[in-house]
């Protein structure tokens, strides 16, 4: 039996949608999310002061995204409504990053399967716990796939390269300034210039803050952290002991000449 003219198999449709979404996401600049000494850090190059890639969802939960702003903004607002309703009807502690990740996975999966155009987004939902072992970082892709990340995650354009550079500097329990320095090192291409503080969007989920854990870092506070992280990086790059200068060997030197 011959296929009708213009027929596209479901498998090919899914591949085409996935390629389309990946290309759209890759055009955006990367965002990194990583654990630090007292919580979870979010860092994104973002020259816009009005359009945020990083936001608060609920008391202990943060949100970061790359891709089309109008699409991930719709997801963010939907997540806030979900959190507010569940926190009001039940208890605030019942609102979790896992629940939000499941909600987003269902929405993204349905859109990817049923719509002609998939969402060109990749998002992270993170929740800070009472200790680092209780922190949760979930990454969701355009088709609704969910990944439970540990320690760090990079998404957006050149995500693999950014994640590789971040792993070079990352370790458990980094102080905030050093974690920020590691994030900026990862987000800066080799030989490239770092984004100035005015073009960075930085926020934390700080487990030591009462009630709402989300805090944006900007202005003088961000400048101080950047200076501290840069100074720490320069100090660690300096060898602890200077190498001893080369000295001539003791005794007579054979020059290769006779006499």
From Swiss-Prot:
<dbReference type="InterPro" id="IPR029055">
    <property type="entry name" value="Ntn_hydrolases_N"/>
</dbReference>
<dbReference type="InterPro" id="IPR022296">
    <property type="entry name" value="Proteasome_asu_bac"/>
</dbReference>
<protein>
    <recommendedName>
        <fullName>Proteasome subunit alpha</fullName>
    </recommendedName>
</protein>
<dbReference type="InterPro" id="IPR023332">
    <property type="entry name" value="Proteasome_alpha-type"/>
</dbReference>
<dbReference type="GO" id="GO:0005737">
    <property type="term" value="C:cytoplasm"/>
</dbReference>
<comment type="similarity">
    <text>Belongs to the peptidase T1A family.</text>
</comment>
<dbReference type="GO" id="GO:0004298">
    <property type="term" value="F:threonine-type endopeptidase activity"/>
</dbReference>
<feature type="region of interest" description="Disordered">
    <location>
        <begin position="226"/>
        <end position="259"/>
    </location>
</feature>
<keyword id="KW-0963">Cytoplasm</keyword>
<comment type="function">
    <text>Component of the proteasome core, a large protease complex with broad specificity involved in protein degradation.</text>
</comment>
<dbReference type="GO" id="GO:0010498">
    <property type="term" value="P:proteasomal protein catabolic process"/>
</dbReference>
<dbReference type="Pfam" id="PF00227">
    <property type="entry name" value="Proteasome"/>
</dbReference>
<dbReference type="GO" id="GO:0019773">
    <property type="term" value="C:proteasome core complex, alpha-subunit complex"/>
</dbReference>
<keyword id="KW-0647">Proteasome</keyword>
<dbReference type="InterPro" id="IPR050115">
    <property type="entry name" value="Proteasome_alpha"/>
</dbReference>
<feature type="compositionally biased region" description="Low complexity">
    <location>
        <begin position="227"/>
        <end position="250"/>
    </location>
</feature>
<comment type="pathway">
    <text>Protein degradation; proteasomal Pup-dependent pathway.</text>
</comment>
<comment type="subunit">
    <text>The 20S proteasome core is composed of 14 alpha and 14 beta subunits that assemble into four stacked heptameric rings, resulting in a barrel-shaped structure. The two inner rings, each composed of seven catalytic beta subunits, are sandwiched by two outer rings, each composed of seven alpha subunits. The catalytic chamber with the active sites is on the inside of the barrel. Has a gated structure, the ends of the cylinder being occluded by the N-termini of the alpha-subunits. Is capped by the proteasome-associated ATPase, ARC.</text>
</comment>
<dbReference type="GO" id="GO:0019941">
    <property type="term" value="P:modification-dependent protein catabolic process"/>
</dbReference>
<dbReference type="InterPro" id="IPR001353">
    <property type="entry name" value="Proteasome_sua/b"/>
</dbReference>
């Amino acid at each position: 039996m011959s296929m009708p003219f213009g027929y596209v198999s479901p498998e090919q449709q899914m591949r085409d949608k996935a390629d389309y979404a990946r290309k759209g996401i890759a055009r955006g600049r990367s965002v990194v999310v990583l654990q630090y000494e007292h919580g979870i850090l979010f860092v994104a190059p973002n020259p816009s002061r009005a359009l945020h890639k990083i936001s608060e969802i609920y008391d202990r939960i943060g949100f970061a995204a790359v891709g089309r702003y109008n699409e991930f903004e719709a997801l963010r607002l939907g997540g806030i409504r979900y959190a507010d309703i569940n926190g009001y009807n039940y208890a605030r502690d019942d609102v979790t990053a896992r629940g939000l990740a499941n909600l987003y996975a269902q929405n993204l999966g349905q859109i990817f399967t049923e719509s002609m155009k998939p969402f060109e987004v990749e998002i992270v939902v993170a929740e800070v716990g009472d200790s680092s072992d209780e922190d949760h970082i979930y990454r969701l892709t355009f088709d609704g796939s969910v990944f439970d990340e540990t320690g760090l995650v990079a998404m957006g354009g050149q995500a693999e390269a950014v994640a590789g550079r971040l792993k070079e500097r990352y370790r458990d329990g980094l102080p905030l300034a050093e974690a920020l320095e590691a994030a900026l090192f990862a987000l800066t291409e080799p030989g490239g210039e770092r984004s100035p503080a005015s073009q960075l969007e930085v926020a934390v989920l700080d487990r030591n803050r009462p009630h709402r854990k989300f805090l944006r870092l900007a202005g003088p506070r961000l400048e101080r952290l950047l200076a501290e992280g840069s100074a720490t990086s320069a100090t660690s790059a300096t060898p602890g002991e200077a190498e001893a200068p080369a000295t001539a060997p003791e005794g007579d030197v054979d020059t290769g000449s006779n006499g």
